[in-house]
Regions:
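C-terminal helical subdomain
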Residues: 161, 176-208, 215-217
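Substrate-binding pocket helix/loop in short-chain dehydrogenase/reductase
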Residues: 80-90, 178
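Alpha-helical segment proximal to the catalytic Tyr-Lys
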Residues: 109, 150-155, 206
Length: 235
């Protein structure tokens, strides 16, 4: 088992991509600590709350004494300029950017030799749809935070981010245009992200830090103009 007895922290690990990541680490022998707002057999808490982050970090260190891998995955909102309130926008940034920064700070002196931080961003850190400002701003923020932390923690902790594209967390299989619009010929699933997380956390990625890796089946490389290849903008 590649991660036997390694201590792994996953935020937002109750469902979706975070759950898949946590389960993959556990199968490889890791000791996995999860924090989520959903009730379950993990640390229950709101990542937007400073005191909760401090209690969670204290709990991890008290139980495990170190951190080998920190995966900042949690992200709560998807609202845009028409509907998103000031408070909702601030909350999205608190969970999506402030919490990853503060957890890195809280664990700074407890990271083991060769430790790794993996931040989950989004392909929306480089492209957008209307009415997605709260989510997009947070994902752009965590992508930038990644290279800043990589510089500050150089020689101690490797820090990288992953930008998923369309990931169906139910592992649904799509056909037709939904699939063919991707160069890879399909929609992604959580294992596509979990596999990269485990690679980046491993010694095989020992020379990779400060990087952002987009996993979107090639979608963001698909240059689209009206009337090209049957694409039509109806507006």
């Amino acid at each position: 088992m590649v991660f036997k007895d390694k201590v792994v922290v996953v935020t937002g690990g109750a469902q979706g991509i975070g759950k898949c990541i946590a389960e993959c680490f556990a199968r490889e022998g890791a000791i996995v600590h999860i924090i989520d707002v959903q009730e379950g057999p993990w640390f229950l808490g709101d990542l937007a709350d400073k005191a909760t982050l401090e209690r969670f970090a204290g709990d991890v260190i008290a139980k495990s004494g170190k951190v080998d891998v920190l995966v900042n995955n949690a992200m709560p909102l998807f609202k845009g300029i028409d509907e998103c309130t000031y408070e909702e926008f601030a909350y999205a940034q608190a969970v999506g950017v402030v919490a990853p920064f503060y957890l890195a700070k809280l664990f700074k002196d407890s990271f083991a030799k060769g430790a790794s931080i993996i931040n989950i961003s989004s392909s929306r850190d480089r492209m957008s749809q209307p009415q997605s400002e709260s989510y997009t701003a947070a994902k752009g923020g965590i992508a930038a935070l990644t290279h800043a932390l990589a510089a500050s923690l150089a020689g101690r902790v490797r820090v990288n981010s992953i930008s998923p594209g369309w990931i169906d967390t139910s592992f649904k299989t799509y056909d037709g245009p939904d699939a063919s619009q991707h160069f890879a010929g399909r929609v992604g699933n959580p294992m596509d992200i979990a596999n990269m997380v485990l690679f980046l956390a491993s010694d095989k990625a020992g020379f990779i830090t400060g990087e952002n890796i987009c996993i979107d089946g090639g979608m963001t490389r698909n240059m689209i103009y009206h009337n090209d290849f049957g694409w039509k903008l109806e507006k």
